[in-house]
């Protein structure tokens, strides 16, 4: 009887731990959201909800690529620079060629090439991803300043602004594009061999290699995807700002990484789900939105974001220790 009771308790504990691991941060977001609805003036208004959706849409998109980088055990610190440079490149090419599609293609190509360089250096040359992407972050940001001559590049073709300001079924186009991105990357991670290979590499790269996983090719594709979604976010941002801004999104990479880790993506690699990314971004976005509505100074917001990042890293460390102990 005692053994049956113990077994049942073990199953119950295990089941709760697994449910918390899967949905815990979404529960935290739900509690936070309800608290903001009750205590923050105008938080629940439709205008603010739409603004919140727009504010986090770019973060969600970039975080999709970062999810794969972190799940494979790497980082991509160049995402913010790619956002800026892709926007500038798109603006310059549109103005020179008078072609929207050529401009968008140029911006996406910039992101893909940046990711290709990152992936090749990290996977083929075996250089640490932190150092590699720190270098490309500087290079790509410098290119953005060179291309734009250090100034905002106004876009002359007003048709381009439709991408950022169009409404589809009552919601801004960037929100729908972000939802599509989340669905695609969620399926890619959970339902494809490429996704399983990504998690296997993050769990144990050498074991994955011995098992026949094409580690080099997979890592290169991961960074190309990260570059592409960052470039897409930069193009949408340029459309909303009606110009390419070389100085935009500075420090944005840390926000995206902290959101991923806060949601449950492991810094050690091998663990990650699209729901973790959604939860992390929603929590960070809601906190920032609430602070703005409460007129909390931008300087204090830096402190809050830093505390959240530190808490996320400590929590990740605690989870890793708990799993090893189990």
Each predicted region: which residue ranges?
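Helix-loop-helix "hairpin" substructures at the membrane interface of multi-pass membrane proteins
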Residues: 99-107, 113-118, 122, 169-244
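Single transmembrane alpha-helix segments in multi-pass membrane proteins
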Residues: 31-96, 121-126, 264-274, 307
């Amino acid at each position: 009887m005692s053994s049956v009771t113990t077994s049942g308790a073990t199953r119950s504990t295990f089941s709760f731990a697994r449910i918390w691991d899967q949905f815990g941060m979404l529960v935290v977001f739900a509690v936070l959201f309800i608290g903001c609805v009750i205590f923050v003036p105008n938080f629940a208004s439709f205008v603010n909800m739409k603004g919140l959706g727009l504010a986090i849409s770019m973060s969600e998109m970039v975080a999709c690529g970062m999810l794969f980088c972190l799940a494979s055990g790497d980082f991509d610190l160049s995402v913010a620079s790619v956002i800026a440079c892709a926007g500038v490149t798109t603006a310059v090419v549109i103005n020179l060629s008078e072609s929207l599609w050529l401009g968008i293609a140029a911006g996406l190509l910039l992101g893909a090439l940046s990711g290709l360089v990152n992936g090749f250096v990290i996977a083929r040359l075996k250089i640490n991803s932190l150092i590699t992407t720190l270098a490309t972050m500087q290079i790509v940001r410098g290119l953005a300043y060179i291309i734009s001559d250090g100034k905002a590049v106004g876009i002359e073709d007003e048709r381009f602004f439709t991408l950022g300001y169009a409404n589809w079924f009552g919601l801004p186009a960037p929100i729908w594009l972000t939802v599509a991105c989340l669905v695609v990357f969620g399926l890619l991670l959970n339902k494809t061999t490429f996704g399983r290979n990504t998690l296997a590499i993050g769990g144990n790269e050498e074991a994955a290699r011995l098992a026949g996983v094409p580690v080099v090719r997979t890592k290169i594709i991961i960074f190309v995807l990260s570059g592409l979604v960052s470039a897409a976010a930069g193009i949408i941002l340029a459309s909303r700002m009606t110009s390419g801004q070389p100085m935009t999104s500075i420090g944005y990479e840390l926000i995206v990484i902290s959101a991923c880790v806060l949601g449950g993506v492991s810094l050690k690699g091998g663990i990650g789900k699209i729901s973790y990314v959604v939860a992390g971004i929603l929590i960070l976005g809601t906190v920032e939105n609430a602070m703005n509505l409460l007129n909390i100074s931008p300087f204090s917001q830096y402190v809050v974001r830093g505390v959240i990042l530190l808490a996320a890293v400590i929590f990740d460390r605690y989870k890793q220790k708990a799993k090893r102990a189990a």
